Amino acid sequence: MVQENKNFATAKAKSVRVSPRKLNLVAAFIRNMKVSEALVQLTFSSKRIAKVVKGCLQSAVANAENNLGLDIDRLVITKATVGKALVMKRVMPRAKGRATRINKFFSNLYITVTEKEDN
């Protein structure tokens, strides 16, 4: 079997304690962005989850550099997908002996960086 020359690297952050809707706001923002620009944007973002996304992105860059020998200056984020993980169900007491259910959502984040050719 002949192995192809890979020019992409991936990283994932599983069971992140944030709802997929909120995480997707940050993931959609950095999609198709250069890695260097995305790291700057995530550093100064006001979103709480941006710190986790930045760590996952740095992991993908390290995978590209160390495992595949890719040039980190030419890396672009080609995929940043968000998926649902588990949901913790909690109970909140309410008035008159009632109770309501609270759902605490978790998410999975997958980031793929690809080395783009200079044109």
From Swiss-Prot:
GO CC annotations, alphabetized: cytosolic large ribosomal subunit
Gene Ontology biological-process annotations: translation
GO MF term list: rRNA binding; structural constituent of ribosome
This protein's UniProt keywords: Ribonucleoprotein, Ribosomal protein, RNA-binding, rRNA-binding
PROSITE patterns the record matches: RIBOSOMAL_L22
InterPro entries associated with the record: Ribosomal_uL22, Ribosomal_uL22_bac/chlpt-type, Ribosomal_uL22_bac/org-type, Ribosomal_uL22_CS, Ribosomal_uL22_sf
CDD domains cross-referenced by the UniProt entry: Ribosomal_L22 (cd00336)
Pfam family name, one: Ribosomal_L22
Keyword rRNA-binding tagged: yes
Domain of life from the UniProt record: Bacteria
UniProt-listed HAMAP family: Ribosomal_uL22_B
PANTHER family named in the record: CHLOROPLAST 50S RIBOSOMAL PROTEIN L22-RELATED (PTHR13501), LARGE RIBOSOMAL SUBUNIT PROTEIN UL22M (PTHR13501:SF8)
Annotated family: Belongs to the universal ribosomal protein uL22 family.
Primary role: This protein binds specifically to 23S rRNA; its binding is stimulated by other ribosomal proteins, e.g. L4, L17, and L20. It is important during the early stages of 50S assembly. It makes multiple contacts with different domains of the 23S rRNA in the assembled 50S subunit and ribosome. The globular domain of the protein is located near the polypeptide exit tunnel on the outside of the subunit, while an extended beta-hairpin is found that lines the wall of the exit tunnel in the center of the 70S ribosome.
Quaternary assembly: Part of the 50S ribosomal subunit.
Protein name as annotated: Large ribosomal subunit protein uL22
